[in-house]
From Swiss-Prot:
<comment type="subunit">
    <text>Homodimer.</text>
</comment>
<dbReference type="InterPro" id="IPR014178">
    <property type="entry name" value="FA-response_TF_FadR"/>
</dbReference>
<feature type="DNA-binding region" description="H-T-H motif">
    <location>
        <begin position="34"/>
        <end position="53"/>
    </location>
</feature>
<dbReference type="GO" id="GO:0000062">
    <property type="term" value="F:fatty-acyl-CoA binding"/>
</dbReference>
<dbReference type="InterPro" id="IPR036388">
    <property type="entry name" value="WH-like_DNA-bd_sf"/>
</dbReference>
<dbReference type="GO" id="GO:0003700">
    <property type="term" value="F:DNA-binding transcription factor activity"/>
</dbReference>
<keyword id="KW-0805">Transcription regulation</keyword>
<protein>
    <recommendedName>
        <fullName>Fatty acid metabolism regulator protein</fullName>
    </recommendedName>
</protein>
<dbReference type="Pfam" id="PF00392">
    <property type="entry name" value="GntR"/>
</dbReference>
<keyword id="KW-0238">DNA-binding</keyword>
<dbReference type="InterPro" id="IPR028374">
    <property type="entry name" value="FadR_C"/>
</dbReference>
<feature type="domain" description="HTH gntR-type">
    <location>
        <begin position="6"/>
        <end position="74"/>
    </location>
</feature>
<dbReference type="GO" id="GO:0003677">
    <property type="term" value="F:DNA binding"/>
</dbReference>
<dbReference type="GO" id="GO:0019217">
    <property type="term" value="P:regulation of fatty acid metabolic process"/>
</dbReference>
<keyword id="KW-0804">Transcription</keyword>
<keyword id="KW-0443">Lipid metabolism</keyword>
<keyword id="KW-0010">Activator</keyword>
């Protein structure tokens, strides 16, 4: 098992998760004692304890005072955040996970957007306009740096859009533009979900954020994807302004079909880092 990690805690977490996935510590089994496991992994017991607590919160393990730590049937106990981890573990199934994400978004968006446009019309319009204006400025800018210097949301963008230490300047620009466009795409769906008045829809997007960023940062590297998304945002705005909420299912379904066509071409040449863990 070859594990790359940036810290002892990251290494321990990956070791345990990959051991669960590969059957070394299968679901239903008991983990080795803390002392034995810390020596096996090569980390301190303090570090291991922190990792075990985190994995328990994420649904991988059950920790009970005075009893051995048990490995869970993680597909029954984990939340949406596990999907990004599964992308790194089950590489052969990665594209299916992406397609499940896109299908789920297409299926639930008409529901929460209908409510958002009804009960929170003004805020919904403001959100969509902000995303349209920012994305139009992004694609029209001479460079990502030029866009950032003129954006009123520069601080927030820098908090959410991380550099990859890419040395080739042209590639760096492409990567940052794609990540920033995805930042706005996520903003649109997540905020409209919360504008619906039902927090559950917004929290679903919160749980999907890491996977959403992984997929969107690649998907929006294609100019056709950005062009299609902007067209969709403008149609959404018109629908919200007109109050014709009954048009949402057909509009969103059509966007899902057209974006899936782009994805089906892009997935034939996935970058090598598409399923790499960033921890």
């Amino acid at each position: 098992m070859v594990i790359k990690a940036k810290s002892p805690a990251g290494f321990a977490e990956k070791y345990i998760i990959e051991s669960i996935w590969n059957g070394r510590f299968p679901p239903g089994s008991i983990l080795p004692a803390e002392r034995e496991l810390s020596e096996l992994i090569g980390v301190t017991r303090t570090t291991l304890r922190e990792v075990l607590q985190r994995l328990a919160r994420d649904g991988w393990l059950t920790i009970q005072h005075g009893k051995p730590t048990k490995v869970n049937q993680f597909m029954e106990t984990s939340g949406l955040h596990i999907l990004d981890t599964l992308m790194t573990l089950d590489v052969d199934n990665a594209t299916n996970i992406v397609e499940d994400l896109l299908a789920a978004r297409t299926n639930i968006s008409p529901i929460f957007m209908r409510y958002a446009f009804k009960v929170n019309k003004e805020n919904s319009e403001r959100t969509i306009k902000t995303v349209i204006d920012s994305c139009e400025q992004l694609v029209a800018a001479e460079s990502w740096d030029a866009f950032l210097s003129s954006s009123p949301y520069a601080d927030k963008i820098q908090q959410n859009v991380k550099e990859d230490n890419e040395k080739d300047e042209a590639k760096r620009q492409e990567i940052l533009i794609a990540k920033t466009f995805n930042f706005y795409d996520y903003m649109l769906f997540q905020r409209l979900a919360f504008h619906s008045g039902n927090q559950i829809y917004g929290l679903i997007f919160n749980g999907l954020k890491k996977l959403y960023d992984r997929v969107g940062s690649f998907y929006f590297s294609n100019p056709a994807s950005r062009e299609l998304a902007l067209k969709f945002y403008r149609q959404l705005l018109l629908t919200c302004e007109s109050g014709q909420r009954e048009q949402l299912p057909a509009l969103i379904r059509q966007y899902g079909i057209e974006s899936a066509m782009i994805w089906n071409e892009m997935k034939k040449q996935l970058p090598t880092n598409f399923t790499e863990d960033d921890c």
